Amino acid sequence: MENQKDVEAEPEITPEMIQSTFKALEAEGLIRYMKGGAYLPTEKGWKLLREVVSGREKIIGYGHEKIIAKDENCFEITKNKKPRGEDSVIAVRADKGCKDLNERFKAAAKTANRMFITIEAGDVTENITAYGSPALRLTDANEIVVRKSDFIDGKTVAILADKSANEFSKEMKKALKNPKTEVKITLEIK
């Protein structure tokens, strides 16, 4: 029987560890994201590691004077006319919830590939990188949430994001507090 001191415990793997590992691989040239997928270098050139299924979705929402955008874990877009006390809301009166997203985009989001998110409010832009997941449900009719963690529920559209509502610029937060501001959110997997 093996001595228990010789057995290594499995490390607890966090979403941050996975994200930093892939960033390190990319920085070292050990993985490359190109048209069609993620590639690894081999003796004969680049080999496809994972095919990227592309998809794109645009969502339109609006600012609101009660938007505070202070959540440290996520940001949320809602069809509601005003935030209901959530500090994650960045846009209200959205034209779509997760359930309304087009089928091509939903299929692409479920491949665990990188998602590029652009939020435009007036002349201010925020860019976020996150990931899809085969576990995404995309069933909520009212909300869309992008999370820094790997938690998934019916309103989650992306996980392991590099930015939460709290990390948006002061200029963006100011623009989001104006009810006249049209907020354009683009979700793209390419």
What are the residue ranges of the model-derived segments?
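Short, solvent-exposed interaction modules
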Residues: R84, T125-K173
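Short amphipathic alpha-helical interaction segments
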Residues: E12-A27
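Eukaryotic, polar/proline-rich low-complexity intrinsically disordered regions
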Residues: S54-I60, K66, K70, T118-N127, ...
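Short, cationic-aromatic polyanion-contact patches
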Residues: G36-V53
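A short, conserved structural fragment
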Residues: E26-G36
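N-terminal targeting and processing segments
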Residues: E51-E86, V92-R93
